[in-house]
Regions:
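A generic secondary-structure micro-motif detector
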Residues: 39-41, 71
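Active-site beta-strand/loop signature of hydrolases that rely on acidic residues for catalysis
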Residues: 43, 58
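Onset of an N-terminal alpha helix
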Residues: 15-22, 26
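Intrinsic disorder at enzyme termini
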Residues: 1-17
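N-terminal flexible segment immediately upstream of the FAD-binding catalytic core
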Residues: 1-5, 47-52
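N-terminal capping segment at the start of a domain
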Residues: 28-38
């Protein structure tokens, strides 16, 4: 495994946040995820230890808005960090993507949907509860898109 960034800061014109997040993801990958990856794949095991590390690093809340206590990263910053994680543990990168997409669906993407005031308030209240669970307790979310009959 290489220990240099796949996204060279100057060539990619990374923002400070993008640089910090990719560095953080690479550090976790090198020091924690890489050694566990083969076991997770061989044993078809969920990478729970890696999720504990992601939670400790604040990365479970990468796309949770800052006003809720998250890192408030945009999609590009998230994608760059995910690519770094994928270099070290595919299972973690794949499942983390599902988790982050759940945050995006309930966050910025949902904000663009038409909702009446009552529904929007209920959505915001519910989303705040889920964000707190992620940030405080390390809750992991995903959506059932690949299961038969689950999507419209």
């Amino acid at each position: 495994m290489t220990d240099f960034p796949i996204f060279e800061s100057d060539a990619w014109r990374l923002t400070d946040q993008e640089r910090k997040l990719t560095d953080q993801a690479r550090e976790l990958g090198e020091t924690r995820f890489a050694d566990r990856a083969a076991r997770y794949d061989r044993d078809a095991e969920f990478p729970i230890e890696n999720y504990r590390d992601l939670h400790s690093a604040g990365l479970l809340g990468i796309c949770i808005p800052t006003e809720y206590g998250g890192l408030g990263a945009n999609l590009r910053a998230y994608a760059l960090a995910a690519a770094e994680i994928g270099r070290y543990c595919g299972a973690t990168a794949l499942t983390w993507n599902m988790h982050v997409c759940s945050c995006l669906w309930s966050g910025a993407l949902a904000d663009d949907l038409e909702m009446d005031g009552v529904v929007r308030k209920r959505h915001h209240d519910t989303r705040a509860v889920h964000y707190r669970r992620i940030l405080d307790d390390g809750a992991i979310y995903a959506q059932p898109f690949s299961e038969g009959g689950s999507a419209a």
